[in-house]
């Protein structure tokens, strides 16, 4: 009937708060489930970034890292790293950190930013390494039936992540990992290997390869190729000379005895 409807309009006109309350209830009833309004104390979403995320330097050098964030009013910003820290510069939305005397081959730096009670972080990896200054393969030296191969890798760091490989033609004849070395200074490495060469091994190049494996970063350097030449050793040559001289002496003795025998037979005739 029209009476309840007219009464509703009358109440809304006489008491404006009733109409607004009814409107709020209607909107609340129509709102989808699982999407309540966020309380006023919820943390503000923000991001944290480090630049650069990966940096490689020579041992003993310094590094500058920049930590930026999108927090309107950060409560705190700090850097956690085992490396020694230097000067820190700050600006709106960023902090610049200086790391001194980097010597560990791989280190992490974490930048932590707290915003509205929530902490986020970003990470940079710092690698200290020195690629081999040179890789030198000495000319092979023949001793008996084996060639002595000697390879020099100079001024390399870290030695513990160095792999030295000798390649003859298309095949690897020797490879050694130097992971037992844990020094924190530049070093020179010499690898010596004896190679028994067969007839098919001559006239093929020998190359020494140096490789640093740094958790995904691979640094390579190689020597100039040296061809394995056929050579005579002094000991076999001397032995052959003695054998030939002995054979000649035997032949001369036999020949002289035969000649004397022939002459004796002729004189008797």
UniProtKB/Swiss-Prot annotation:
Signal peptide (UniProt feature, chain positions): 1-20
Sugar-modified residues: 66, 76, 188, 221
Membrane topology: Single-pass type I membrane protein
Domain Ig-like C2-type: 60-122, 144-215
Pfam families per record: ICAM_N
One GO term (biological process): cell-cell adhesion
Keyword presence, Repeat: yes
InterPro entries, sorted: ICAM_N, ICAM_VCAM, ICAM_VCAM_N, Ig-like_dom_sf, Ig-like_fold
Keywords: Cell adhesion, Cell membrane, Disulfide bond, Glycoprotein, Immunoglobulin domain, Membrane, Repeat, Signal, Transmembrane, Transmembrane helix
Gene Ontology CC terms: plasma membrane
A GO term for molecular function: integrin binding
Residues spanning the membrane: 239-259
Topological domains, Cytoplasmic: 260-269
Extracellular side: 21-238
Processing after translation: N- and O-glycosylated.
Annotated localization: Cell membrane
Disulfide pattern: 67-111, 67-115, 71-115, 151-208
Protein's UniProt keywords contain Transmembrane helix: yes
General function of this protein: ICAM proteins are ligands for the leukocyte adhesion protein LFA-1 (integrin alpha-L/beta-2). ICAM4 is also a ligand for alpha-4/beta-1 and alpha-V integrins.
Family: Belongs to the immunoglobulin superfamily. ICAM family.
Protein name per the record: Intercellular adhesion molecule 4
Species this chain originates from: Pan troglodytes
